[in-house]
Amino acid sequence: MKIQTNAVNVLERTSAYLRTGVIKETPAWYNVVASIPPVTKFTREPHKINPSTDKKVSELKDPDLESVNRNGLYKTRFNALERKVANKQIYKPPKLVYLEDKIRTLFYKQHPWELARPKIVSENEINTNPDWKNMLQLGQPLDGENVVQRTLYLLKTKEQSNITDAYDQARLEFYRLRMQQELEEQVAAEEAEMFGSVFGPSTIEHGVTKEQQVIEKWKRDAELQSELLSAKKENASKAAGDASAVSSEKQVEDDVVNFDESTDADQEVLHF
């Protein structure tokens, strides 16, 4: 089948039509196609460079002429598997990687208990244009997201040239604010108790109470099951003892009957 080249020559034909007056107005796509002309080479070649990463997909290594296989022969050529170019994923889009995700993952890996704090999804939507000159933001609680955004701000404003130093500075500010927050909460609780406030059990105490109730129920069920098993064993042993006693009595009766029969037979023989 002949290769169709009409679409490739559209720029030349349109230029000729414009010069001869066949087309009066320049098409909207003319300048774009003129700046980026279509490819005129139709020879298909294997893609050995990934256009997304500009890295080689595969590269044949020179055979090791000094190594000998198990048959005592030298390898001088590539096999079919080595010549195969694995370019199935060459046009697969690369994964999107953001610096925020790396910082966020590192922070919550180092501080896993920060994930246990209650959080509302709409908290970040309150202030859509925050200024991260300060760690604390109006309407947004202190959490790991403050550390992430503060680190990016330090890098963007060139206050810290290294991401490690920026992350350490953001963590230090976070620790100071967290300690201040916990101290304020503790002082407020002590003042409230001084004025007569009574606080109920905390979440941890409530969980421990519920767990203890389950353990007590399990203990009662285990004791009941143990009593049932011991009763079954006693009944089984008692039934086995009764059966052995009945069989022994029956054996005695049979022995007595056999003895009487043998005695009568001996007396008849003597009388005769």
Curated annotation (Swiss-Prot):
Keywords: Mitochondrion, Ribonucleoprotein, Ribosomal protein. The keyword Kinase does not apply. Residues 233-272 are annotated as: Disordered. Pfam families: MRP-S25 (PF13741). One of its GO terms (cellular component) is mitochondrial small ribosomal subunit. Its main location: mitochondrion. Residues 252-272 have a biased composition (Acidic residues). Transmembrane segments: none annotated. The keyword Ribonucleoprotein applies. One of its GO terms (molecular function) is structural constituent of ribosome. It is found in: Mitochondrion. InterPro entries: Ribosomal_mS23_fun (IPR016939). It comes from the Eukaryota. Component of the mitochondrial small ribosomal subunit. Belongs to the mitochondrion-specific ribosomal protein mS23 family. This is Small ribosomal subunit protein mS23.
